């Protein structure tokens, strides 16, 4: 019997079956580009049996459309765990019905989320030591940068998309938090964001 895995419970529940295996025996499907990159940075790419279509890998692996794939389509791959950033296409319910382990790791909204997710992935693929070293080095470098940051009254507008509308970032997003930490005035912080997504939509008039 496989068990449902959710981010906050991962470190406790994974020990029931998945983390008992050697890392090169764990079969991971990553439907999140960010977490594919984390796995590669921890030198655990041998765990990947499939990745989303935006992940860049230089080794043979099945490529999957994370927006449309169903749990039924993933089941024949026999994954030990599926990594998700979003619940596209109702896949979470499908994975639960198929009794396939999954980890839901939504986009990080601050540095602590980033560190926590790296360490979570490290635990998942038996690279705890590498994950700890990575987050330790990141904290040192980020603190050094922040200590030396001096942008005065600098303001910034960060546009992240135009194909489906004009979108920016506010302080509810990781990028927005970085700007806040640097002391930069982020213009989009004052833009309405009704869903609290961290990525407010702007009109062309607001953009100008």
Residues covered by each model-derived region:
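A short, structured surface patch at a secondary-structure boundary
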Residues: 27-91, 100, 184-187
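C-terminal motif of bacterial Sec signal peptides marking the signal peptidase cleavage site
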Residues: 13-14
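His/Asp/Glu-enriched short active-site or ligand-binding loop at hydrolase and phosphoryl-transfer sites
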Residues: 52, 61-62, 174-198
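Short helix-initiation/N-cap motifs at beta->coil->alpha
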Residues: 63-72, 192-205
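Sec-dependent signal peptide recognition
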Residues: 1-8
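Stable alpha-helical elements in mature extracytoplasmic
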Residues: 34-38, 44, 70, 87, ...
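Extracytoplasmic substrate-binding proteins
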Residues: 20-27, 91-167, 188-190, 197-199
